[in-house]
From Swiss-Prot:
Residues 25-52 form a propeptide. The presence of a 'disulfide through disulfide knot' structurally defines this protein as a knottin. This is U3-theraphotoxin-Hhn1d. Ion channel inhibitor.
Amino acid sequence: MVNMKASMFLTFAGLVLLFVVCYASESEEKEFPKEMLSSIFAVDNDFKQEERDCAGYMRECKEKLCCSGYVCPSRWKWCVLPAPWRR
């Protein structure tokens, strides 16, 4: 019985030690993933979203008209696809 308790304690202590070591090494390398992601997802001015004269899918349509292929139902105030039975 004592041997089983000791082995469980050592297993638990080993897991805690592993967690602490992993956390310490990850906190040292926190800047690397941020730098990597910022370089991958860098936004260029050419790729920014352009302002449209019409509202796209699931956009508010109170002041703007919906783009072609979408409707602005009176029940909801955002552009959605027309219902199949209304086409």
